[in-house]
Amino acid sequence: MITTEGTRSLETLDIEKLLSILPHRYPFLLIDRIVEIDGEQEAIGIKNITINEPHFVGHFPAKPVMPGVLILEAMAQTAGAISLLRLGNKQTNLVYLMTVDNAKFRKPVIPGDQLKIHVRLLKKRSGMRRFSCIAEVKGVRVAEAEIAAMILEKE
């Protein structure tokens, strides 16, 4: 995990910077900010979970729970943002999720939670990236997965 010890230079991305990097928009932009970036190696993203999100209407009306697939998407967006950030001209590239491996959902994520998404680059080869991802709420692991993504030029 990222620490603030030593001489690392850590970056952050607010919502305006994220909107300039990622193509996602409401209701499918699933990260609010990135609070720490260490090069292209690691990042921590934040998603504040609110009852106003459209998926809670049907998942589940009496006991709202964030769908696991949206937690995975938040992981992918965090990884994609740091990948695109390092490419320079971000507007000409897109990141496509290719695989999800070893996904585990350990605890429900509910309105009022703050999802903290840790991503760490495992492998980088030409346009492909593989990341280890962990999602936490209040320091407790709620989900984890390994994801692979491909960076391609927009056509």
Swiss-Prot record:
Keywords, A to Z, come to: Cytoplasm, Lipid A biosynthesis, Lipid biosynthesis, Lipid metabolism, Lyase
What GO cellular-component annotations does this UniProt entry give?
cytoplasm; membrane
Tell me, what is one Gene Ontology molecular-function annotation carried by this entry? (3R)-hydroxyacyl-[acyl-carrier-protein] dehydratase activity
Give the positions the UniProt entry annotates as the active site.
Answer: 59
Function of this protein? Involved in unsaturated fatty acids biosynthesis. Catalyzes the dehydration of short chain beta-hydroxyacyl-ACPs and long chain saturated and unsaturated beta-hydroxyacyl-ACPs.
User: Which GO biological-process labels does this protein carry?
Assistant: fatty acid biosynthetic process; lipid A biosynthetic process
Q: From which residue to which does any coiled coil extend?
A: none
Q: What organism is the protein native to?
A: Bartonella henselae (strain ATCC 49882 / DSM 28221 / CCUG 30454 / Houston 1)
Protein name listed in UniProt: 3-hydroxyacyl-[acyl-carrier-protein] dehydratase FabZ
Q: Which InterPro entries does the annotation name? A: FabA_FabZ, FabZ, HotDog_dom_sf
Q: Which reaction does it catalyse?
A: a (3R)-hydroxyacyl-[ACP] = a (2E)-enoyl-[ACP] + H2O
- The residues that cross the membrane are none
Q: Tell me the domain of life.
A: Bacteria
